[in-house]
């Protein structure tokens, strides 16, 4: 699993720009997921779907239904983002069980990037759904004095997203390393099962929190608009 730290270890540099293990693994995951998505859609068939296609359809249908339960009115708008987030984080969490690979989500810079992207998406989808004027009015209602508190709330939950995922994945890998150092390879299967379960749970939690934040932003503005129109 390699050694973990607050930042991924340096691998090499390109033009003075440091490339870390987490960056390399992230590139590998992105390329792999792109190839998998392309191969699935390229060979997609309505009459004779392959087992591979049925598996992906089942996974995406489950995600779609989960998002629809939270935000049915805007499911088509936010489904691509949340589903991509779920899949990427899950693969990033799981790849650490493969010898020689480093889990990008055990790197604080990666989880911070995901949290910032989620933070931006909350406002992007809110503006798409309500318009930028109505959306921004929320931060100064009922009084402009609440603006600093709204900003603090947005920043704090973004930090919480980043630190939560990073802390859980890094501690999981460190725990597995310590157990393997003490017990050797007598208990690899329980450790592997624990890693897989935790990886799935953390990906689900991060994706659901992102979904709830997006839904909360959109619905809060819709409720305010409805209340003002009454």
Curated annotation (Swiss-Prot):
Alphabetized UniProt keyword annotations: ATP synthesis, Cell inner membrane, Cell membrane, CF(0), Hydrogen ion transport, Ion transport, Membrane, Transmembrane, Transmembrane helix, Transport
UniProt GO molecular function: proton-transporting ATP synthase activity, rotational mechanism
GO BP, one annotated term: proton motive force-driven plasma membrane ATP synthesis
Pfam short name (any one): ATP-synt_A
A GO CC annotation given for this chain: proton-transporting ATP synthase complex
UniProt subcellular location: Cell inner membrane
PROSITE patterns: ATPASE_A (PS00449)
TM spans (from-to): 17-37, 78-98, 107-127, 165-187, 198-218
CDD domains: ATP-synt_Fo_a_6
InterPro entries per record: ATP_syn_F0_a_bact/chloroplast, ATP_synth_F0_asu, ATP_synth_F0_asu_AS, F0_ATP_A_sf
Membrane topology qualifier: Multi-pass membrane protein
Family: Belongs to the ATPase A chain family.
Subunit organization: F-type ATPases have 2 components, CF(1) - the catalytic core - and CF(0) - the membrane proton channel. CF(1) has five subunits: alpha(3), beta(3), gamma(1), delta(1), epsilon(1). CF(0) has three main subunits: a(1), b(2) and c(9-12). The alpha and beta chains form an alternating ring which encloses part of the gamma chain. CF(1) is attached to CF(0) by a central stalk formed by the gamma and epsilon chains, while a peripheral stalk is formed by the delta and b chains.
NCBIfam families: ATP_synt_6_or_A, PRK13420.1
Protein purpose: Key component of the proton channel; it plays a direct role in the translocation of protons across the membrane.
Protein name in UniProt: ATP synthase subunit a
Native source organism of the sequence: Legionella pneumophila subsp. pneumophila (strain Philadelphia 1 / ATCC 33152 / DSM 7513)
Lineage: Bacteria, Pseudomonadati, Pseudomonadota, Gammaproteobacteria, Legionellales
């Amino acid at each position: 699993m390699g050694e973990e730290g607050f930042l991924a270890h340096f691998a090499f540099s390109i033009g003075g720009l440091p490339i870390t293990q987490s960056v390399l693994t992230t590139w590998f995951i992105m390329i792999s997921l792109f190839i998998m998505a392309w191969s699935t859609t390229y060979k997609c068939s309505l009459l004779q779907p392959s087992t591979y296609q049925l598996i992906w359809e089942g996974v995406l249908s489950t995600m779609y239904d989960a998002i629809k339960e939270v935000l049915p009115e805007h499911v088509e708008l936010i489904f691509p983002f949340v589903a991509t987030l779920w899949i990427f984080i899950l693969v990033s969490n799981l790849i650490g069980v493969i010898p020689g690979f480093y889990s990008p989500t055990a790197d604080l810079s990666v989880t911070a990037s995901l949290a910032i992207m989620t933070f931006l998406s909350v406002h992007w989808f809110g503006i798409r759904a309500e318009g930028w004027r109505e959306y921004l009015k929320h931060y100064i209602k009922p009084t402009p004095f609440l603006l600093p508190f709204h900003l603090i709330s947005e920043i704090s939950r973004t930090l919480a997203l980043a630190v939560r995922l990073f802390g859980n994945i890094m501690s999981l890998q460190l725990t597995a390393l310590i157990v393997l150092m003490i017990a050797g390879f007598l208990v690899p299967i329980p450790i592997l099962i624990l890693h897989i379960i935790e990886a799935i749970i953390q990906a689900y939690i991060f994706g659901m929190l992102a979904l709830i934040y997006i839904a909360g932003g959109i619905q809060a503005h819709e409720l305010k608009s409805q209340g003002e129109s009454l």
